[in-house]
Regions:
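A glycine-rich, acidic short-motif signal
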Residues: 49-60, 69
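Aromatic-patch recognition
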Residues: 59, 66-196
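Sec-dependent signal peptide cleavage junction
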Residues: 18-52
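Long, compositionally biased interface segments
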Residues: 195-242
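Bacterial Sec-dependent N-terminal signal peptides
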Residues: 1-24, 235
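N-proximal short alpha-helices
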Residues: 50, 177, 188, 204-208
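Exposed alpha-helical structural elements
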Residues: 29, 102-105, 110, 203, ...
Length: 242
């Protein structure tokens, strides 16, 4: 069953009769998540990407597909991350695949939660967390550092800005744009809670009030920046020792 991962994935996307008969929703297999229900959801998501066609910019930080391993998938596959939709696209390697079936969206399910690029550039994790706006999110974060259950995560994000039609003949239409947003950083504590990475000493101490003296000593000795990614990794490493 595992050897036909792509065939099963394609079959569900095309809603073929054979897929419906061979892959019932209740069956516990490595491709069970690619059920009719999920295919409908992700087909709708793919259709929505049509909004990008006339937009300036890209929904991807890297438009190229990259070989990666995905938990729950027995073989490496080529993927790319849609930073606007916060979703992963799996390349369809079938010969003569139609233009609108060149890739499929990966279901956001626990069994596919770890995505590691083979070239070592990215380790994506599907997690539940509260974003910088205190909104509950089930989405992908990039693992930048991990030790003793303390993890530094990075969020790459692209915003879609709708275009505007000119109000009169003297003005010009404004096209839709895809704009890279400022990266967000999160810290997973030993309790497994994921919080926004502290922006200063005061906020770091607020997370570990009983370790105030140790934190003050570390910051005074090392003088790390709370906005530099490399220094954030050093702070996370220090936190892992608390």
């Amino acid at each position: 069953m595992k050897k036909i991962f792509f065939s099963a994935l394609c079959a569900f996307t095309f809603f073929s009769a054979s897929a419906q008969s061979n892959f019932d929703i209740g069956r516990q297999t490595s491709v069970d998540a690619f059920s009719r229900r999920n295919t409908e959801l992700y087909r709708e998501g793919r259709t929505n990407t049509e909004k990008y066609e006339k937009a300036i910019g890209s929904a991807y930080t890297n438009e190229k597909f990259t070989l990666a391993t995905i938990s729950g998938v027995p073989e490496a596959v080529s993927v790319r991350y849609n930073a606007e939709a916060d979703s992963f696209e799996v390349q369809n390697n079938e010969t003569n695949a139609p233009a609108d079936k060149k890739f499929f969206a990966l279901p956001k399910q626990t069994e596919y939660s770890n995505i590691d690029f083979k070239n070592g550039t990215y380790k994506f994790r599907l997690l539940n967390y509260k974003d910088v706006n205190d909104k509950e999110v089930n989405g992908y974060l990039i693992e930048k550092f991990s030790k003793n259950d303390v993890v530094l995560y990075k969020k790459e994000k692209i915003n879609y800005i709708k275009g505007r039609v000119a109000e009169n003949s003297y003005a010009m239409d404004s096209p839709a744009k895809l704009v890279r947003a400022k990266d967000e950083f999160y810290l997973q504590l030993k309790s497994k809670q994921i919080v926004e990475f502290p922006k200063n000493k005061k906020k770091l101490i607020a997370l570990f009030e009983d370790k105030k003296e140790a934190i003050n000593t570390y910051l005074k000795t090392n003088d790390p920046s709370f906005s530099d990614e490399n220094d954030m990794a050093k702070i996370a490493e220090f936190v892992s020792t608390l």
